[in-house]
Amino acid sequence: MSYSSFSIAQGSRVPSLSGTRSSSSYSLKSDLIPQSRRSHSVYGTPGSIRISSPSMPSAIVSSYSSTLSSALPSSSYGGNSYSSSTSFSSGGTDFLLGTSGKEAMQNLNDRLADYLARVRSLEDRNRELEQKIREWYEKQGAGTKRKDFSHYFKIIADLQNQINAGNMENARILLKIDNAKLAADDFKQKWEAEQALRLGVEADIHGLRKILDEMTLARTDLEMQIEGHKEEKAYLIKSHDEDMKALRSQLGGQVNVEVDAAPAEDLTKKLEIIRQRYEQLAEKNRKESEDWFIKKSEELNKNMASSTEALQTSKTEINELRRTIQGLEIELQSQQSMKGALEGQLADTEHRYSSTLMNLQNIINQKEAELSNIRADIESQASKYKILLDVKTRLENEISTYRTLLEGDAGRSHSSSHLSSTVSKDKVPVSSPNVITKVRTIVEEKINGQVISKKEYEGSPDQLSYY
């Protein structure tokens, strides 16, 4: 009768442990194993760890190569990769460790020592990198202080206040310019109104001048008529005197002959009456002409005086408006030149401070990129260090598992069958507190290679029993 196949499972994986036994079923517990056989020691230095045991069943190390590689996970850190696999084989049916078993144990210890030495070297390298990072931070202390841009914020705030003040000053200047433009437009409208009034007055003066010319012509005509009447009067007087003389001479040389006839009219009286009438008519015409001329002259003088005063007032106002417009134009030109200078100064200031801000932003981006790279390196180092810690913890768990297996299988010293085992352990994170380790034992009875019976048992590693 032979036993075949028992398995130890942790988590969800169930590796198999197979072997043959010639004795009947029995229960192997840790309390039944003598202290001498269960004694073992784990000792180590910072560079190595050794596991020693006075005896170790060959069933544990027969097929260890296929499962230890999964129990000891491969890891890479800092460009170095490590993988662990160990194989043990038993010579014959001896359950005690022979020469090959000791060599396998030594090989395992050497591999474990090498692995832990690599872990220690990586830890040393990690410490060196951390020291270099701290030294770099100490060297870059001034650079890290430059990352405090609070004083730049104050300068930027002052510059923004200056820019705002310049904008307000520009707004006030623009408002003054607009007010000056409105005042200039108002004065221009007044000037246009006065210009229209002036043109109207000049047109009236031109019309009055035409009237004056007409009156002058009429006066000249009347004077000429008066002169003609005077000449006619003188001619009439002269002709009258001549007629009188002729009549007197005729009367003196004739004989008076009285004839009973109607009395003759007195021509002198008639001529005198005619002369008086002409004189009265001429005097009347002269007085009427003089009165009309005086009246028209007074009206014309009054109109000319009022027009002259209005024209003088208009000229004065025009001169004042012209001077005001010239002053406003000069002020407008000065304000425009000041505006151009302020705009150029503002553009220069904005360009200069935009360049400064761009340089500061580039420095900030560079420092942030350096900080991101350093943070990424630190996170990478931390993650790799965490992986190493996990590997170390798993390795310690593996050592604990080896210790348990050494304690559990130390009593199997009288079996002559060949037993091969495969131990596998899942990569369960150490930080998972809810993982329960269970052991399932499968016992098969075979006769001539045929399975007669098969039994399965489950329990924790401390409760493992063999039947």
UniProtKB/Swiss-Prot annotation:
GO CC field: cytoplasm; cytoskeleton; intermediate filament
Ranges where the IF rod domain occurs: 101-413
Annotated stretches, region: Tail: 417-463
Region feature Disordered, mapped onto this chain: 12-32, 409-430
Protein name, entry field: Keratin, type 1 cytoskeletal 11
Quaternary structure (record): Heterotetramer of two type I and two type II keratins.
Gene3D superfamilies: 1.20.5.170, Single helix bin, Vasodilator-stimulated phosphoprotein
Region of interest called Coil 1A, as start-end residue ranges on this chain: 101-137
Gene of this entry: krt11
Keywords: Coiled coil, Intermediate filament, Keratin
Highest classification ranks of the organism: Eukaryota, Metazoa, Chordata, Craniata, Vertebrata
